[in-house]
Amino acid sequence: MKLRFIRSAGWLFLLFCLACNARADLPPLSSKPEQGRATPSGEGDDKPVVIDTERIRGHHEYESGTRSESELRSRSTISTDQIKKPNQKADPAAKDTPSAPQQNYTLSPAIKTDSRTGTSAQESEKAESMVLPGGVERLPGPAAEEGEPRLRTRTQSAPRTLSAQKRGEKPAKTPAPAEADQDRPGFAEGERIGGHREEAGDEKLRLAGETEPEAIEQKLAEAEAETDKQSPVFVVADRLQGHVEEEIEAIGKAELSAGPQFISAERMKYNQGTNDAEAQGNVRVEKEGDILEGSDLKFNLLSKTGQLSEPSYRLKDASSRGYAGMLLFEGENQYRLQKASYTTCPVGDDSWVLQVADLKLDNDKKVGTAKNVKLTFKDVPILYTPWMNFSYSGERKSGLLAPTYGTGSRTGLELAVPFYWNIAPNYDATFSARLMSKRGLAINNEFRFLGQNSSSNLLADIVPRDLDTQTTRWRTSFWHNHYLGAGFSARLDYNRVSDATYFRDFGNNLNLTSRTNLLQQGLLSYNRGLGDDGTFNVTSLVQSFQTIQDPLAAIVVPYKRLPQVGLNANKPDVFGTGVDVNLSGSWTNFSHPTLVNGSRTVLFPSMSYPLRNSFGFITPKVGMHYTRYSLGEGAGVSEENPTRTLPIFSLDSGLAFDRKMSLGGESFTQTLEPRVFYVYVPFRAQDQLPNFDSAKTDFSFAQMLAENRFSGSDRINDANQVTFALTTRLLESSTGRERLRLAVGHQLSFIDRRITLETPQTIDRRPDFIAAVSGFLTPTISTDTSFQFDQTRLLADVVRSGVSYRPEPGRVLNFGYRFTRDVLHQVDASSQWRWSERWQTVARLNYSLQDKRILEGLAGVEYNACCWSLRFVLQHLTLATQKSTTAAFLQLELNGLMQIGSNPLTVLQRSIPGYIRTGSQGSGLIEGP
């Protein structure tokens, strides 16, 4: 019995020891952060696992428990089925599906410590919340001490490579692990990781050995600031080996990603301590669209310095590419290429190439700087410079523009080298040296300024010594607008040339060579409101002109205004009566070297009573026009202070009808707008009055509905006439856009018109009829045509007609006809036509049927390749002196780099309505020695 008791007690003692031993093998359930707190099954499934990558040195370390080193070496790969992610349930079907693994390694900045038993032990607590199988190969390296993070691998059923991450692909779902994996080392399901920043409602955790949470927060803040300086580093490869604290080697389809930087190669090494990366075999570096490829790479992720051997490169912003013997990384977005090439042509097309001994690309400023540059076009060297600076983004920058070449019959061969100075974002300057074989050297300057309340432009050209005339010749043009505040604004205009033939000798377009009066003016204006809807304006100006005379067709020099003060005031609905009151007036002192001088005072008060509703209006108006002259003694006139007073009465009325209609399957709104305008002005003899500024206006719809057919204030017509006008418009119902407008007008005078500009005055009683059509006849054909007829003789007095055919961008045909009886008779045809993706022609012919000569002729051809364009244009221009000049333009444009030769684009855009530039969308600036 005693023996049985002793035996039973022994068995109980043995069982107690075994139970204690088993108890010792379980993780303790204390509050210490080393063990963590297990969450009951089912709780926290919806709560995210927060990982503080800042405090975790290796996301793929795990504690191997009691496994021996030999057990760790027993397997080199991990089956995807053995991975258990938090909050995932087991999938029995997944156990029998092996997959080829790819090892991943994630690095982030570590917190350095002096002790392996202190903070290092704490950091090991923050491993990724993932349960891993035990059969993992231990990588070569020093044995990990207790608490020190060790490298571990991660496998996925469908590995999401870093390149897939860059493309934004969603990761494939990983099969759920078997339930047998639940007791393996790792964090429990739904467990919060100690040390992350606590959000509202999070349970506060303390690191081992720490008692004050404030100290924890301070350490976390310091660690977070350190992490901000360097993005986490992710490494993916077929096989990883090495040690987290030292060097990691990735073998087979290796990929490294750190922020926007992405590197891939066949083989790669990464040292976390120094942040150095080395890669060999099919190296590819990507950053924000830039792609660099080479054979060997050495790169520091922190300093962004290193080198890439035998690289090819493609820049996203510039759409450029090239090759080099060596590429040096010299900091963030700074590349230096040695023995390099540069082009914007696509791969396989080297139509033009910059061959450079040393090329530096500043990817922040988008500027390239090259040394010892040779430019080849179609394998033919066309330019060499020891130094070049260019923008590959199209933005403004200081530097030399590409030289321009050209030829003209009056200037000879030309070469111009312009320099652009980008002084500030709101003002710049361009200086150009222009060498002409027949004229010598010309210096051209342009300055532009744009301020918040002002803007300016200055042109200054000089030929120090014209080889033809042996004189100094020059031109200046300046304008400035300025808002002074409080309703005041000012404008200055000054234009002058050294002689009357300057534009004929140096101009290259008809508008320039036919200029006759160059404006010189200073203006000060004051504007304010009168009540809610009234206006008040006072203007003062000083004005004169430089008149460029044609020896074969002399013109009268305009009067100078020294000065002129004008007043305009308008007040609608005065005192709520519905009456609109208007007052206009001026005082002007006119000066002329050969004609009558004097001053003129003009006052024109008027009142109108507009009546309007939804379908029409009627507006009676009455005014009194008063004019007084002070001609002074010796003016050669019969009266020194003549005056004129004229009452003016008008009645304007109109109706508006509309209807819905369908035309060609489209829905339109058609309007019908009849209008009747009557004006009465009694006759007053005006022969004794000087004519300072009056001229006859061109007959048009606007002039038909005006009270005076003369401009200025010296001549006021006698009138007792009525104008009938009818307008119909076709509006798109969906957008309200006007598709077509038709209008006819007839002016009927009840008296003989006795006031004319001629002396002696003649009677003019001819009734006038006008018709006009404008808009789109079809989606591709538009017109703007007007006719004025003499109904007595059934002859056209004025014809203006223009038709344009534009089926698509780059294809346009224009035809124009202009006729004014006894004045001009011209035809004008122009075209830009793209025959293929690359070839197009341009042409213009402006011919005078009255003079039987070509006013302007132009013909050219353009070839647009994908990365370069070539333009050749011939221009024949008739000058105001009945002489002519011929110019040739030849330009080679290298897309994204420069334009070489004389630029015909300004001539083409002015001469051919609807011309659009095809090929390059801009060229850069170059800067030379």
Curated annotation (Swiss-Prot):
Residues 26-208 are annotated as: Disordered. Component of the lipopolysaccharide transport and assembly complex. Interacts with LptE and LptA. The keyword Membrane applies. GO terms for cellular component: cell outer membrane; transporter complex. Residues 154-164 have a biased composition (Polar residues). Its main location: membrane. It is found in: Cell outer membrane. Together with LptE, is involved in the assembly of lipopolysaccharide (LPS) at the surface of the outer membrane. Belongs to the LptD family. Residues 1-24 form the signal peptide. Keywords: Cell outer membrane, Membrane, Signal. It comes from the Bacteria. One of its GO terms (biological process) is lipopolysaccharide transport. It holds the Pfam family LptD. Residues 44-74, 181-208 have a biased composition (Basic and acidic residues). This is LPS-assembly protein LptD.
